[in-house]
Amino acid sequence: MIIDVGEWVLRQVCARARTWLDAGLLPMRVVVNASYRQLNRGGEYFDSVARILRESGLDPQRLELDVTEETFLTDGSTAVRTLRTLHELGIRISVDDFGNGFASLIRLKNFPFASIKIARSLIHHVTVNPDDDAVVSAIIAMGHSLRMSVVALGVSTAEQVTSLLRHQVDLMQGYYFSRPLPVDSCTRLIQSPRLPPVRTRIGVP
């Protein structure tokens, strides 16, 4: 079931992204989750992704696949080999919910990930727990040192935004900016983006 659903989701997302681009909306990248089970299908999954991109007319560089830390725990696994071939096609690969699993930093360094996405559980307490704040700061610094962009997941308050800006995070995602939207509402948001107020001036002691 997850294989069929995953393929359907990818096809719908790629087709919608192509429609937005054809309508002259801002160049964008769409993100789809890829499960370990899907990636472990190897060439069959790669062929499916390549076919969907070809049918939709979407440039592979406009697609990003999110994977969990478990996906690259074993060097040389079918899943890791599949990720490498997808990366060679031009697709961006990112680590989702980083900080929740047991990823080896060596493996993180050795794979050309485009970005790491900090787990919601760490972001949730970033303004109230100094230890979480320190871990988030360290992850952002590490990601930048490895030439990756860093995304904060689950951002829900202005205070979290201010803290993450201070740590120089690249992107933020969460209910503070928008709840999940149906396609029509999402299209209107892309056409006329309205972001909530953010205190962007960071005080210097």
Where do the PLM segments sit?
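Short, flexible helix/strand-to-coil boundary loops that buttress conserved ligand/catalytic motifs
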Residues: G43, K109, T127, I190
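Residues at alpha-helix caps and immediate loop-helix transition turns in enzyme cores, especially N-
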Residues: E44-Y45, T78-A79, S104, V128-D131, ...
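Cytosolic catalytic cores of cyclic-nucleotide second-messenger enzymes
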Residues: I3, F98, V126-A134
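C-terminal helical cap(s) of enzyme catalytic domains, especially alpha/beta-barrels
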Residues: L165, L181-P205
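Catalytic core of bacterial c-di-GMP phosphodiesterases, primarily the EAL and HD-GYP domains
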Residues: M1-T78, G154
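The catalytic core of metal-dependent phosphodiesterases that act on cyclic dinucleotides
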Residues: A50-V126, I140-P180
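Short acidic-hydrophobic sequence patches enriched in Asp/Glu that either
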Residues: D131-V135, F177, P182-S185
